[in-house]
Amino acid sequence: MLRLTLHIIAACWIATSCTGDNNLRRLDTTSSTHVYMDSMPELKSRSDLINKSTLHKEHVHEVIFVVQQQNMDELTAILHDVSDPESPNYGQHMSGEQITSMTMNPIAREAVVNYLHASGAIVTAESLDNEFITAKAPIRVWEKVLNTEFFTFQQEQIDGDIEEHIRAEEYSIPLELYEHVDCVLNTIEMPIRLTTKPVSYEVALPAPKKGRFAAQTTYRGYVTPPVIRSYYNLSDNHGSDSSTQAIFGGRFDYLVSNDLAKFQSLDDIEIDQPAIDINGHIVTDISEVPAGSDCGEGNLDTQYIIGVSHGSPTTYWSWQVSLAGWLIAVADTIDPPLVLSISYGGNEKFISPAEFRVFSRMAIKLGVRGVTIVVASGDDGAVNFEARGNLGKCGYFPVFPASNPYVLSVGATSVSL
């Protein structure tokens, strides 16, 4: 298969360092014991957030303390080096254990855990490299620890359903944790607002018959795996056991195995289903897809990634909240898939600096391990999807995570059939 090894494709400007140094910290003017960390004033302009209300102080909430990492500048330089085809170190990736020994911060980790225990919080999980410490406690505890107030935000989905998220509008951290904590997740960041459905037009086309995809390079009106292989000069569609790959599945997206089998029969290839289903979003038939969900991107991504790399072990990895959270989970595996495909995104201005920073750091660590993250650049160009039908919202609005400098951002190819 075509093994993608380019890790750096786009550039972006953010107010804080992608590698972990936060230059915006200042003393919290409301407290002599805390340091201001982050806020999201943009929440007030999100049209999908329709209500904000207070919640009971004994309600238990889970947050993630992100521990400051060491030697991230050096690790970033290594990423550039091993990703450069002209470098003598090209392709000489590091193991997860080597990266952990280089970046982990045991002193900071111990300080955070001790503080949480003393505050009455319960540590429920730690990542393999101790960078992420998950803890739960009543809201009253977090409001004291983070010098903030939490609310229940209601988020309206595209289908009209309402999801609730417990978040604050800003937060600070205690002075004694200032040198040890990069940020705290599940505080201000919200799930990306999914784009509306792409604009489409129905065109009457005859349905291809079994094996027709393979019988000719093009079939008028259809972008098939043979078309892609021909256009990009791919010799064949055979992958290998070592070329592992994974598809990110959004929280409302399902993969339908019957559809995948039908698609593969059109290409006249042996049925090849994903080997691993993480979080249970693969169903046999479309009738099993829950109300309010669909099987659009999940089907499309899986059909075509297997269509150009048949036989490569494939994982369908669904995730319910943030893309940064998903990447944390991937990076916390001993043997992550070597190619990660993401066809989702949202307006970057609604991504907190901390979430962008964490995503970048995970992408750097995965890149040094030889993992390529391929992200669709979006359907609407520079103006982003909110300008559909509303020219007043035209402007330059980057799409995250395609805007991240440590992913391979992929646009569309216009093919005349």
PLM-predicted stretches and their roles:
Residues 1-5, 23-26:
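Acidic/proline-rich low-complexity IDRs
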Residues 414-416:
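A shared catalytic/ligand-binding motif for oxyanion handling
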Residues 19-21:
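Boundary of Sec targeting at the N-terminus
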Residues 3-17:
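Cleavable N-terminal signal peptides of Sec/SRP-targeted secreted and luminal proteins
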Residues 23-128, 134, 139-412:
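Substrate-binding/charge-relay-adjacent region of secreted/lumenal peptidase catalytic domains
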